[in-house]
Amino acid sequence: MAGFSHFSQPPYRDLWEPPRPGGERESTQRLGGQRSGADSTACSRAGTPGAESEAGACWLHPHCSFTPRPRRRGCSDSLRGSRSLSDVARRPLERSRKHRPRSRRLEDAWGETGTKPRPAWQPQTQLPPQRPQPCPHYPLAQGDSPPPCPGGAGTPLSGTFRVEKAQGGDQWAVPLGRHLGRWSPSSVPSERSSVPSQKFKRHSACVCAQKRDSSDQVESLASRDSQPLASSKEMRSPHTQVLKSKLEEVVVSSQDQQIVALVLTRLKKAQRIRELQQQAAKAWEELKRSDQKVQMTLERERRLLLRQSQEQWQEKEQRKTLQSPEQRGLRRDSQRKNVPPGESRWKEQPEDQESPRQEKLEKARAQAEHRKQCQVRRLREQEKMLRNLREQHSLQLQRRLVEACRKRHLHAVEGQKKVQDTNLSSLINYQARKVLMDCQAKAEELLRQLSLEQSFQRSQEIHQGLRKERQRELREKAQKEEEQLQQARWRAGESEEQRKMRKRILVELADEKIRQARSHVHKTTRDKVQHLRELNHLREKNHHILKLKAEKEEKCHIEGIKEAIKKKEQRVQHISQGKDPNFQEFQKLPQASRREERAPPNSSLDQMVLEAQLRACQQNRGY
C-alpha cells in the first residue's frame, strides 16, 4: 500500500525543468501591442475597462505564469480539423531541443530585407466584431469547459482570429495578457506541487506591477516606432486594417480559465489527502504504543500472580511441616486417654511397634495429598490465566484485523482516486498547452503576414519614390543641357543638322540612363523576392523536420504513460483480489492461533514459548 504515496511524483523530468531565460523579453516587447490591443477590445465589450483581465490573472506569479509555446509554421489548419479531446493526451511534453527563438528569426528576416514591420498597435478604424460560431459537433455540458472546435483546440478552420466566446456573455473570457515566448515547463501544474492558494494571492501585486510595466513599454515602443512611419499611405489599406483588428481581438477562452481553476482544486485536494495520510500515520503510531503498553502491563501482572502463588504454596508447606509433630503428639495423647486402663498395658507394646510405621504412612499419605492438591490448584490457576490471556489476545486480534481491513480499503480507494487525479491533471495540462500554443501560433502567423505586407508596401513606396526622383533629375538635366546647346549654337552659329543630331544624341543618352535605372530597380526587387522565397522554403523544411521529431517523442511519451497506467492497474487488481503478501499473512495468523487453541498445553515452558512466538508474529505484522 505504500506504493500509492508515490503517484504524485512527476512521470517525466521535462515537465519540471526550469524555463530557458533567453527569447522571452524580446518577444514580449515586440508582441506587447497585442496585449494592450486585446485588453482594450475585451474591456470595451465587457463594459469594465481592464477589471476582468486583471482579476482573472492577478493570482499568477510572474515566474509561474503560463507562457505558451509557439506552434511552428507550415502546418495547415486543415490537418487539425479531425482532432478531438481524446487526442490531447497524445501531445508530447516540452521537447529539449536547441533552436533559435522565433523572435530572433523574425528579426533576421527583417534585417535581410532591409525593413522592419510596422507596429500593430497603432490606432486604426476597427471593423465590426465577428460573432463566434458555436461548435456543432461538441455540445456543451453543465459544469464542464467548452469543447474545442473541429478545426483543432481553439483553432478555427478559416485560419483567422475570432473572439472565443467573449461576445457570448462568458464571464471567464479575458484578453491575452501573457508573454508570447516559448512554453515554460515551470508553468505546468502537477500533483507534486503543494503550494496553497494563499501563495498565489501573495504574488498578485507583483503580477499587476509587471502588467503596468509591460503596458508602459508597449506605449513607449508605439510612440517611438510610429513617428518615422506616420507618412505611409499604404498602411491605411483595408487588408492591413483587417489583420490588425484580428490581431487585437485575440482573447483567452473560458476553457483556459476553467482549466486553471480545476488545476487549483486538484492541488488543494492533493494537499488535503497528504494531511489525512499524516494524521492516519500518527494515529497508527499511537495505537501501536498503547498496544505495547497493554502487553507490558499484562505480562507484569502475570508474573506477579505467579510469584504470589509460589509464595503462598511455600508458606503452606512450611506451616504443615512445623505443625505435624505437635498434631501427632496431641492425637496420641487423646488416644491414650480414650483407651481403658486394663487394655492399655498389653496394647502398649504393639502400639509402640506399629507407631513409627503408621507415622511414616501417614506422613507419606499427607505429603502425597498435599502435592496432589497443590498440583491441581496450580493447574487450575494456569488454565484460568491461559484462558484469560487467550480471550484478550483473540479480542485484540479481531479488533486489529477489523482496523487493518478498514485501512486497507481506505488506502485502495485513495490510490484509485490518486490515479484518476493524476490522469485528469495531465489531460488538463495538455489541453491548456494546446490552447495556448494555438493562440500564439495564430498571433505569430498574423504578425508575419502583417510584416510581409508592410515590407512589400514599403519596398513599392521606395521604388516609386526613386523612380520619380530619377525622372525629375533627368528632366532637369535635359533642360540644362538643352539650354547649354542653344547657347552654344547661338554663339558658334552651327547648322540646324548638327543641332538636331546633338539633341537626338542627348535624348538617346537620357533614355539609356532611364532604362538602366529601371532595370537596376527591377533586378533589386526580383532579388529580394527570390531571397524571401528561399528563406520561407528553408523555414518550411525546418518545420517539417521538427514536426517529425515531435511526433516521434509524442509516441514515446504515450507508450511510457500507458505502461505506467498498466502497472498501476495491475497493482490495484492484485490488492483487490487478495494476492498481496501482507493480506496473506493476515489470513495465516488466525489459522495458527486456532491450531494452538486446539492443541493441549504440555507444560508452562511450552506455553511460554508459544506466547513468545505469537508476540513476535504480532510485532512483525504491526511493523
From Swiss-Prot:
Compositional bias of kind Polar residues: 217-230
Biased region (Low complexity) positions are 76-87, 184-197
InterPro entries in the cross-refs = DUF4659
Where is the region Disordered?
A: 1-241, 314-376, 574-607
The biased composition feature labelled Basic and acidic residues covers: 14-28, 344-376
- Tell me, what's a Pfam family for it? DUF4659
What are the annotated disulfide bridges? none
Where on this protein does the Glycyl lysine isopeptide (Lys-Gly) (interchain with G-Cter in SUMO2) crosslink form?
K528
Question: What is this protein's name?
Answer: Coiled-coil domain-containing protein 185
- Native source organism of the sequence: Homo sapiens
Q: Give the encoding gene's name.
A: CCDC185
